[in-house]
Each structure stands twice: as structure tokens, then as C-alpha cells.
């Protein structure tokens, strides 16, 4: 029998949406395939609301809290400091490992997952929800128009050690059309995760390795790369409409932005919260 709702996607957002539907007794299945992992390199930064949302779903999180964010402009003397205490919060953000979260979500949604071969007839499904831009599922998502922009940048992410940075602090610096952010990860002393956005003209792994010491000097610490370096091309995309009759977009399928904003999954979780609430209202009215 076909589910009332089908969420389509291969990442974290699709599985989170399915779990939230299940928690609210909404009939939902996930059209997905084997998850893609990143060798424990990729990380996610959650705001306090998103962190509490995952806790509400019973997800176990090994998170590295950020209580302060320090932003520098390397060509001047400007510094902006943000503190959780100033906002009355325990922390400003939490850094978690992407692979660990996806692996846990994949296990929690096993009984809800369906393959394309299992769901060939979509006529009895009331609502299809698209949760990412996985090319495997692009054929299902053809009724939406998007506004897109190429940032002409590549983001490099990797783990690093830094001996003089404070444990619960995140640091961000702007220089030469580049953005460098370093944040705590794994609750291991002096271990951090880095996201470094570099113009495509000179964005290479060699450039990253050759210039990491300069970033360390700007932050008054030594920074040493540890392990693999991942690279992602950066662009933004926003749907002109998020919902049409029988179809909705959430998370990366609806909008994607520069990692500078730190919104990523946070916006996706907000989408999930709002859309499932609308489903609950419709269900209470017998729709």
C-alpha cells in the first residue's frame, strides 16, 4: 500500500523529515538509496534550536559546543566577538560529525525506506516532499523554477590541530576574497574542523597546504592539517515557490547558500518543523 506522504532524498534532511512524521503518527516513507559518507571529515554546525530538535527525536549527539565566535578582518584591526552569555544561551552553536548523524538516521529510518523499484506508482501518494538535489531523484522534481548563482569559489574542509585556540571558541577570518573558519570538533584537545572558501582561480589542495601557516599566523597559533581534504564547489539556489499542489520542497532542494551563513541544515530543520506542523493541522481536519 502506498504511503500518504513520500519524502524523496538521499541525505540527512529526508531522513529527519521521515522521523518527525513518524513521531507525529503521519504515514510517510522515504524514497532513497545508499547514503554517501565522507570518511568522517565533513561536519555540520547546528544552532541551539536545531540541536534541541534532534534531541527531541531521540538522536544521540556527540557535539562540540561553541560558546564564543570571534570574527576577524585580516587587512584591518576590526574584530567582532559573539558570546552565548550575552544572549542568555548555554552555547551559540554545536558542531557534529556529518557521517555519524547520517549513519544513525539511516538506521532509525530503515523500516521507512523504499527504493525506486518499490514505488513505481505515485498516483496514490497525497504529497511528495523533496529534501535534497541528489541527481538520482531529479526526474521527480521537474515542476519548480529556481534562482541560481555561482559563487566562483570552492570550499575546502578538513580536520586540523591548533595548540593555542580556545576549546569552545570558533574563529572566522576574511582576507583576499577568502573566508576561513575553524571550529572545535570531537571533544579532543587542540582538534578542530576547518571550512575554507577560496576563489576558483587558485583554489587547489596545494594552495591550502601551502598557505595554512599564514592563517595560523593571523590567529596567533600553529595550524597543522590532519587527514584528508574534501572540496565542494559553492553556489546558491532558491526555489521561486516551495509548495505546489501535491509537491513541496524542503532543505537543500528548496534553498542552498554559502557556508559563511552557517545555515545549511538549520534552515532544513526549520522547514521540516513547519511542514510537519501543517500536515498535523490537515490531519486533524480529516484532509
Q: Can you describe what each PLM-predicted range is?
A:
Residues 3-6, 10-68:
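Glycine-rich FAD cofactor-binding loop and adjacent beta-loop-alpha segment at the N-terminus
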Residues 125-128, 132-229:
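Conserved FAD-binding catalytic core of PHBH/FMO-like flavoproteins
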Residues 5, 28, 126-128, 248:
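Hydrophobic "anchor" residues on beta-strands that sit immediately upstream
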Residues 9, 32, 73, 132, ...:
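Short beta-strand/turn micro-motifs composed of small residues
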Residues 52-56, 64-157:
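Conserved N-terminal helical subregion
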Residues 35, 135, 255:
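Short, glycine/acidic-enriched loop or turn micro-motifs at the edges of active sites
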Residues 203-285:
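FAD/FMN-dependent oxidoreductases across multiple families
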Amino acid at each position: 500500500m502506498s504511503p500518504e506522504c513520500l519524502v524523496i532524498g538521499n541525505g540527512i534532511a529526508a531522513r529527519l523529515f521521515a522521523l518527525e512524521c513518524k513521531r507525529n503518527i503521519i504515514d510517510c516513507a522515504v524514497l532513497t538509496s545508499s547514503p554517501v559518507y565522507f570518511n568522517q571529515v565533513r561536519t555540520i554546525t547546528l544552532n541551539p534550536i536545531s540541536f534541541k530538535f534532534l534531541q527531541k527525536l531521540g538522536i544521540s549527539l556527540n557535539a562540540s559546543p561553541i560558546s564564543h565566535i570571534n570574527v576577524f578582518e585580516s587587512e584591518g584591526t576590526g574584530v567582532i566577538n559573539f558570546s552565548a552569555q550575552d544572549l542568555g544561551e548555554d552555547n551559540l552553536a554545536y558542531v557534529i560529525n556529518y557521517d555519524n548523524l547520517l549513519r544513525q538516521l539511516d538506521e532509525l529510518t530503515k523500516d521507512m525506506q523504499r527504493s525506486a523499484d518499490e514505488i513505481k506508482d505515485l498516483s496514490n501518494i497525497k504529497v511528495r516532499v523533496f529534501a535534497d538535489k541528489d541527481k538520482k531523484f531529479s526526474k521527480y522534481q521537474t515542476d519548480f523554477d529556481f534562482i541560481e548563482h555561482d559563487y566562483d569559489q570552492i570550499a575546502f574542509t578538513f580536520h586540523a590541530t591548533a595548540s593555542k585556540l580556545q576549546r569552545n571558541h570558533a574563529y572566522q577570518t576574511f582576507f583576499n576574497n577568502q573566508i576561513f573558519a575553524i571550529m572545535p570538533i570531537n571533544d579532543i584537545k587542540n582538534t578542530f574542523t576547518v571550512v575554507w572558501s577560496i576563489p576558483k582561480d587558485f583554489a587547489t589542495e596545494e594552495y591550502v597546504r601551502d598557505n595554512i601557516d599564514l592563517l595560523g599566523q593571523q590567529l596567533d597559533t600553529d595550524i597543522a592539517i590532519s587527514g584528508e581534504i574534501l572540496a565542494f564547489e559553492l553556489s546558491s539556489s532558491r526555489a521561486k515557490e516551495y509548495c505546489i499542489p501535491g509537491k513541496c520542497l524542503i532543505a537543500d532542494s528548496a534553498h542552498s547558500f554559502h557556508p559563511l551563513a552557517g545555515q545549511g541544515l538549520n534552515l532544513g530543520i526549520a522547514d521540516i518543523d513547519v511542514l510537519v506542523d501543517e500536515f498535523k493541522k490537515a490531519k486533524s481536519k480529516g484532509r
